[in-house]
């Protein structure tokens, strides 16, 4: 009986049945323990005959705490590695007596265990211990911490200890706790980046909302006491007279990067500010109270995380509880200005160079002096890259399509009335589709009418599959001087404009071996001009022309034969000789010459000439009436084919 410290009736927490509890001190009869019997009578009988109904070894207990829940207001909870025990007293005074007695017995047990042969004590005593069920949410899921744990609150730490485990599974510093709260029977803790688990939340379920509220209040008190302890340490003695400027914790439209925030914060701290207001400390219940999900998201966005070596909570507690004076002002962000070779800087400006690979300055004839200096400076910078556009070029994506506007080198004129030839083609293998071709004004000066004469009819005119669709009528081209003609006299070749020389090969015509050449007409509308004057051709022959002005006089290979020639064919010559001597009013396209088939039959030169026709009529056998019919036939041919056609370089019947 000498080892009994205290005895009396208490109720068990779960069953709420009264039991007779006996608190024994460590000694020769056993270690410090808490025994309970069914009643006092059984205890007296068991003193000599039997043992207690239950025993709790206090040397294995790592927490003894006062609690209260919805049903029992005066609880004592003792936690061990394997389990625990909770008892309820009748009043607060009785609760305090048992609590103090258990702590004294534990202190005696620690004193005895300090001897070398004594067993090791399970570790430092915790201020508070709660049995919780960590839910698979947040860090409980990502760190695989779900299950039954003991949440142990020490002086500076908060640990999670599994059942039948000697060491805590996770130990969180109170300085790393950003906030905590409870909702119904759930209690959550949010930690920052400095925690061993990383940033996130831990959600724990307890018996009821009263226990959750008790956990909330107890941990907040520990955090508050810890923040008060850290308060004098956050201010250095050298800066005691200089208040620390704290930026406003409001939302910024464009938050700067962390590096710029740090630079601006140091620059403000170096400047002394007088009469700076000191923010009032905020209450703990306001910042760490339970909020709705919408309010929590707003609170998360409004908080500013500071990168201090102490911890996330240390910095947050300084801001929350006003541990250091500060000035609430709008931060001024000053980005650093590194040297030319200090960092690998990539400029994203609008006007800059496009790539690191640049041509030598000597090869760029069109580069201005300012740009040349920029290129020279750029070659000295190894790690510098400009991602913008070229500086001299300030186009907005607009391409002028008018004939008289200034054109760049890669501009292609699309108007048939443009007489000035474009710039020379610089890309190999490129075929200009413009009717004005690619003749360079620097290489060849064009005049109207041209000095070069090109004959119609080409032997290799069928080597190209290109068809000219541009009409040379007066309504679609600039009108040359009327006194000049494109087609020569009967003995000379046909003249073509000098702009034709810039066309692809399919527009050039080589001279025919025959002495006389004729130009065909494929225009749908034949216009009349002043009689007695030479006339320019109304269209170009469908047959191809030779290329002469493309770079390198490039000749395209023969066409595989996609082109299909559609032309009018005249009746056989035998039918014409046997039948009437009248020349049919048909024109056949052949090598760029228009022939009257009947006249071709009467005379071999293929021309409906008056003197030749008259000679053939004289040589014709028959009476004078037949010769008159032959002469009449020539006049009808003249009227049928039209004066425009017979006047375009062909000798008509006169």
From Swiss-Prot:
Residues 514-524 have a biased composition (Low complexity). Keywords: Phosphoprotein, Repeat, Transducer. Residues 235-245, 307-321 have a biased composition (Polar residues). The modification Phosphoserine is found at residue 276. A motif (YXXM motif 1) lies at residues 345-348. Residues 228-329, 473-494, 507-532 are annotated as: Disordered. It comes from the Eukaryota. A motif (YXXM motif 3) lies at residues 398-401. GO terms for molecular function: insulin receptor binding; insulin-like growth factor receptor binding; phosphatidylinositol 3-kinase binding; SH2 domain binding. The keyword Signal does not apply. Residues 3-107 form the PH domain. The modification Phosphotyrosine is found at residues 36, 345, 398, 411, 430, 563. Residues 126-230 form the IRS-type PTB domain. A motif (YXXM motif 4) lies at residues 411-414. The gene is irs1. GO terms for cellular component: cytoplasm; intracellular membrane-bounded organelle; nucleus. A motif (YXXM motif 5) lies at residues 430-433. The keyword Repeat applies. This is Insulin receptor substrate 1. It comes from Xenopus tropicalis (Western clawed frog).
């Amino acid at each position: 009986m000498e080892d009994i410290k205290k005895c009396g009736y208490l109720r068990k927490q779960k069953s709420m049945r009264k039991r007779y509890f006996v608190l024994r001190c460590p000694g020769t009869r056993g270690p410090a323990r808490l025994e309970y019997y069914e009643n006092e009578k059984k205890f007296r009988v068991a003193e000599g005959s039997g043992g207690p109904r239950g025993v709790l070894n206090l040397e294995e207990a790592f927490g003894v705490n006062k609690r209260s829940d919805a049903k029992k207001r005066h609880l004592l909870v003792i936690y061990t590695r394997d389990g625990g025990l909770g008892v309820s007293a009748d009043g607060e005074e009785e609760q305090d007596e048992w609590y103090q007695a258990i702590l004294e017995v534990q202190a005696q047990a620690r004193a005895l265990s300090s001897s070398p042969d004594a067993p090791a004590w399970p570790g430092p005593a915790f201020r508070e211990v709660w049995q919780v069920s960590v839910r698979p949410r947040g860090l409980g899921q990502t760190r695989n911490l779900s299950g039954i744990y003991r949440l142990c609150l020490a002086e500076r730490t908060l640990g999670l200890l599994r059942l039948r485990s000697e060491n805590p599974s996770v130990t969180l510093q109170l300085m790393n706790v950003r906030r905590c709260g409870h909702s119904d029977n759930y209690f959550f803790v949010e930690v920052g980046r400095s925690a061993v688990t990383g940033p996130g939340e831990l959600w724990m379920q307890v018996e009821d909302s009263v226990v959750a509220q008790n956990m909330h209040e107890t941990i907040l008190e520990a955090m508050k006491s810890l923040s008060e302890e850290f308060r004098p340490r956050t201010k250095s003695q050298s800066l005691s007279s200089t208040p620390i400027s704290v930026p406003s914790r409001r939302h910024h439209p464009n938050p700067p990067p962390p590096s710029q925030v740090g630079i601006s914060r140091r620059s403000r701290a170096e400047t002394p500010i007088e009469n700076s207001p000191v923010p009032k400390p905020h209450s703990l219940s306001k910042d760490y109270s339970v909020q709705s999900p919408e309010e929590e998201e707003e609170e998360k966005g409004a908080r500013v995380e500071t990168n201090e070596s102490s911890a996330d909570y240390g910095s947050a507690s300084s801001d929350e509880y006003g541990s250091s004076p500060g000035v609430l002002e709008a931060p001024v962000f000053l980005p650093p200005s590194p040297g030319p070779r200090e960092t690998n800087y990539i400029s994203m400006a609008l006007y800059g160079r496009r790539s690191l690979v640049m041509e030598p300055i000597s090869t760029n004839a069109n580069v201005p002096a300012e740009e040349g200096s920029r290129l020279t400076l750029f070659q000295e910078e190894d790690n510098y890259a400009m991602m913008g556009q070229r500086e001299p070029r300030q186009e907005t994506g607009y391409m002028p399509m008018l004939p008289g506007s200034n054109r760049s080198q890669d501009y292609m004129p699309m108007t048939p009335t443009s007489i000035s030839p474009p710039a020379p083609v610089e890309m190999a293998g490129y075929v200009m589709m413009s009717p004005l071709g690619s003749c360079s004004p620097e290489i060849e000066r064009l005049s109207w009418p041209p000095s070069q004469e090109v004959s119609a009819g080409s032997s290799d005119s069928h080597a190209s599959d290109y068809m000219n669709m541009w009409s040379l009528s007066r309504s679609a081209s600039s009108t040359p001087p009327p006194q000049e003609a494109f087609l020569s006299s009967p003995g000379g070749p046909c003249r073509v404009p000098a702009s034709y020389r810039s066309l692809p090969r399919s527009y050039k015509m080589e001279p025919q071996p025959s002495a006389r050449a004729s130009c065909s007409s494929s225009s749908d509308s034949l216009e009349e001009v002043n009689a007695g004057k030479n006339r320019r051709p109304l269209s170009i022959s469908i047959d191809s022309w030779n290329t002469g002005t493309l770079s390198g006089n490039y000749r395209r290979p023969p066409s595989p034969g996609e082109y299909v020639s559609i032309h009018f064919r005249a009746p056989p010559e035998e039918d014409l000789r046997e039948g009437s001597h009248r020349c049919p009013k048909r024109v056949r396209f052949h090598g760029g010459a228009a022939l009257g088939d009947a006249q071709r039959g009467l005379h071999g030169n293929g021309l409906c000439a008056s003197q030749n026709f008259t000679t053939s009529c004289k040589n014709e056998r028959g009476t004078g009436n037949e010769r008159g019919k032959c002469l009449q036939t020539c006049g009808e041919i003249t009227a049928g084919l039209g004066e425009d056609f017979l006047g375009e370089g062909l000798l008509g019947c006169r």
